[in-house]
Amino acid sequence: MILQSPIIHHVDLLLVGGTLRAVATAWKLKQQGFRVFCITPFSYFGEDLCSTLDLFAPKGREYRELFGTGDSLLPMKIKHTLDRKFIDAGIDYLFQTHPVQIVYDRNGIPAGMLVANRSGFQIIAAKVILDATDRSLVLRLAGAPFLPFQPGVYPVDLNVIGEVACRPDLWIHPCEGTVADGGKEYPVVRVTKEIEFRENSPAALARAAVAIRRAVWHPDTVEIADRCRNFAKSAARDRPQRAA
């Protein structure tokens, strides 16, 4: 299939994914005069904290630089602050936009990315593409070699606000803080469940996510994270090579 898509931006750096470290990198490069554009499949930045409800994780240097504090913030504050950082810096971005294919120049050098969203397909021409996706999607699209996946039993973590089911196959780790809503304080816990993986395909990861979400549910559960954290992922080799 041949797609004729418009080139909507020419930039020095295209950021794919909106994790905290990636946002900090893009923001710093913009301050140095580079042209930066960002896309994320989510409807906000800070997806590594907000979509996982990882609110009480240790705060690193990027967190303190972006938010000016080491205190734990609620998702709405995180999203709003990162939005304002990009808007005030003049960084253009698109939410709910997915990487589709690497675009190459006549010499076979990566020159941008074909992306998709509700408006259709567009091309963003870029000298450098920074992959900040959960499963290294850009590297995979570029044909980078990955280490073979080793089937087996892997832990899957899911953060939950409120009560969780008491089951022998669940390990519950209370977080340091609580979340207040409507005058009530709710505990935040990280639940771990071991799940067997025969493969690490998107379908297998989705089945694991459904399994742990069903396992943790309790009538007094307040909120369950949109994403779980699983360790059944293959890593890229140390020196990925672009496919010919």
Indicate residue ranges for each PLM-predicted region.
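Anionic group-transfer/hydrolysis microenvironments
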Residues: 14, 42, 133
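Structural motif
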Residues: 12-13, 128
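Flavin (FAD/FMN)-binding glycine-rich loop and adjacent Rossmann-like elements that form
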Residues: 1-7, 48, 60-64, 94-95, ...
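Conserved N-terminal/central alpha/beta ligand/cofactor-binding core
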Residues: 2-10, 24, 28-108, 140, ...
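Glycine-rich Rossmann-fold phosphate-binding loop(s) that bind the pyrophosphate
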Residues: 16-20
